[in-house]
UniProtKB/Swiss-Prot annotation:
The modification N-acetylmethionine is found at residue 1. This is Metallothionein-1A. The keyword ATP-binding does not apply. Monomer. It comes from the Eukaryota. A divalent metal cation 6 binds at residues 37, 41, 44, 60. Coiled coil: none annotated.
Length: 61
């Protein structure tokens, strides 16, 4: 569980555009929770969902 996030790993997340999660792996987490994408990834902000920093994100080149 991410100390900056109230949701359980793999669960539903209530954070959206103002997400402060750093290692959040919630299935519904979006935007800045996308740990496998760079912070400036425009496509990520459009709804990319990543489940781990080690995964390659399909939204990023």
């Amino acid at each position: 569980m991410d100390p900056n996030c109230s949701c359980a790993t793999g669960g539903s997340c209530t954070c959206t555009g103002s997400c402060k999660c750093k290692e959040c792996k919630c299935t519904s987490c979006k935007k800045s929770c996308c740990s496998c994408c760079p912070m400036s990834c425009a496509k990520c902000a459009q709804g990319c969902i990543c489940k781990g920093a080690s995964e390659k994100c399909s939204c990023c080149a």
